[in-house]
Amino acid sequence: MSALVYFSSSSENTHRFMQRLGLPATRIPLNERERIQVDEPYILVVPSYGGGMAGAVPRQVIRFLNDEHNRARIRGVIASGNRNFGDAWGCAGDVIAQKCGVPWLYRFELMGTQRDIDNVRKGVNEFWQQLSRSA
């Protein structure tokens, strides 16, 4: 299996989801001055912020993806959000999928449920298997 990369704000909702998921993952730093580079294909797990499509993707994630090295390795995106955002629920996944030309694989609310954890575990495994067969 390849990597998961995620960002979690100070609310730690996405971080708690990733801990429960129990798969190897790299966290995009909260501090905007810290940078990371990912050297293998990865699925990005990202929260969505309110304010519509324009403000949905966290700045740290934008900075991470603006690095061509990182952008070249993204293979899919999973988004979290809050259903209170209505149509914009989880829309960071849609924005990133469109801009990076990758599939939007799943969306979950806040910290996710056990069903979300199970679905993501299974889906991530199947996604990497399918991708490796088509390579």
Curated annotation (Swiss-Prot):
Pfam families: Flavodoxin_NdrI. GO terms for biological process: protein modification process. InterPro entries: Flavoprotein-like_sf, RNR_Ib_NrdI_bac, RNR_NrdI. GO terms for molecular function: FMN binding. Probably involved in ribonucleotide reductase function. Belongs to the NrdI family. This is Protein NrdI.
